[in-house]
Amino acid sequence: MNIRKAKTQDVIFIYKLLEYFSSKEVLLPRSLAELYDNVRDFFIAEEEGKIIACCSLHSCWEDLGEIRSLAVEEKLHGKGIAKKLVDLCLKDAPQLGLNRIFALTYVPNFFKGLGFKEIPKEELPHKVWKECITCPKFPDCGEIALIKSI
């Protein structure tokens, strides 16, 4: 398995992976335009030239970043791929001037295992809510907010 920064040629494969999980309502859908605009935020994992997982670190505010669009092919769950991707995002964060990283997730125990602490969503800056407001599940999505200082 190889993990690297995403390139524009990877976007269609990232899109398909995210589309699968958004159809199951466990991730927010991302448009192709949004993915192309934010391709530099993404790390991907590939095996034999095929993208099997992705994760992005998105800069949100001053020193605050968000882990988002974390997806691993279902048949590969439990193999530590998601942890490796999040660890790379956390390692990359200080280079961007980010020292607090949050996630909004339906799988809080995964992030707690990586040292994230649960917080009330209201503690996050209002800028974070720009995507939430357009979500069909807003305001009762059930996602849990977690944060980690690095």
How should each PLM-predicted stretch be described?
Residues 78-91, 103:
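Conserved acetyl-CoA-binding loop-helix of GNAT-fold acetyltransferases
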Residues 50, 73-84, 96, 113:
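Conserved glycine-rich acetyl-CoA-binding loop
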Residues 105-131:
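Conserved active-site alpha-helix within GNAT-family acetyltransferase domains
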Residues 93-106:
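Conserved GNAT acetyl-CoA-binding A-motif
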Residues 2-14:
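A short beta-loop-alpha structural element at the N-terminal edge
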Residues 124-150:
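C-terminal "cap" of GNAT-fold acetyltransferases
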Residues 44, 50-58, 63-71:
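Conserved beta-strand in the GNAT
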Residues 18-51:
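Active-site rim helix/loop that mediates acceptor-substrate recognition in acyltransferases
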